[in-house]
Amino acid sequence: MGAIKNGTMIPTPTGNVPIENLKVNDYVFDESGSPVSILGTFTYETPTSYKLYFKDGRSIITSEDQIWSIRKKYASHIITTSLDMFSKGVQGGRKKKYYKYLILNNKSVHFSSQSPLPVDPYVLGVLLADGKTGQTEVTISSTDKYVIDKCSKLMPRENTPHCWGNTNSWYFKLRTPYHSHSNRLVSNYQLKDLLKDQIVLHKHSENFIPEPYLISSLESRLALAQGLMDANGSVFNAGSVIFQNSSKQLALDFLALIRSLGYSAYVLTYKFPNKKTHVLNYLVNITRRSSDRTKLFTLPRKLNRLKDYEGKHKKRLIPYIPIVKIQRYNQPTKVTGLIINSDNHMFLADNFLPIHDATASYKKGVF
């Protein structure tokens, strides 16, 4: 029966959990992103294991008999195992020009957290991308008045943005939440209390998305992504949709956020010239092998640019992710299998990869 390497993080309705820590009656996600209970677990040591690499940067280590639902190139869907795919090779054609095995990309997931968020998700997204906090104000750098006005309406109290001279920097003078009729500005302590310490912004290279936002409701996560994309997202002529910033952790957090919304994406690095030095930037490329990317923007100029491209290139959406490499490890590895309360016997593993549980029946051929 198939199993996954211990230590692999499994997304659950309350956050990620190492697979070996999951218990009967705990919940994971099925392939549609809905919570589903665990009926059984088992752990054992396997003499060999296999690491599968996917084209969008995801990877996972499994036992040799781990079962997969695969769409084979130029063929229908089949059921196969990690060992079978390794033995036959993942590339096909005379010159090995294409990848033979593809898995269906995950759907958006539904976390169970109902905790109130201290800052509106859209505003937080803009702040993480283009904002900073001072002693008595929040500043956002943007050439798009649309973004500034939207943030103004979503602040704890709608307040008028002020521009720093002839620059593109706009600041909001946040007033104390305890004296609504007072003109006294909040102190730095109160500002940190309002935004919560982990959200106060300092260096852009150190920004990250707080955990409560990554496991918030579908609507909140989408609003957060929209704030980040309206501020630091780009749509290129070739149809690429990119999020760019200088924080590695923010890039990884954004990648997790996007994948939880049902998008396929991967991270690239780029050294951006800055006077005499080169600043390392992180680019998250959101591929067309995923959901409707137009939902990620509300800023009209970016949204219309993407809609214009999608309208001219009405290529059928391909929500499948190719397996590009499989590596075998000939050493003992502890693995854990799950039995899921689902008719399809599927759940989402690390990075929301759809995978079969240990009870799925295996047979070669079409299903």
What are these regions (language model features)?
Residues T8-P13, V28, Y50-Y53, V284:
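A short beta-strand micro-motif
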Residues M1, V24-S34, L39-K276, P319-F367:
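Intein-associated homing endonuclease modules of the LAGLIDADG/DOD-type, together
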Residues K315-L317:
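Extended catalytic core of nucleotide-activated donor transferases of GT-like folds
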Residues G7, I79-T80, K276, I286, ...:
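Intrinsically disordered/low-complexity terminal segments and short unstructured peptides
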Residues L280-H313:
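Polar, glycine-rich mid-to-C-terminal structural blocks
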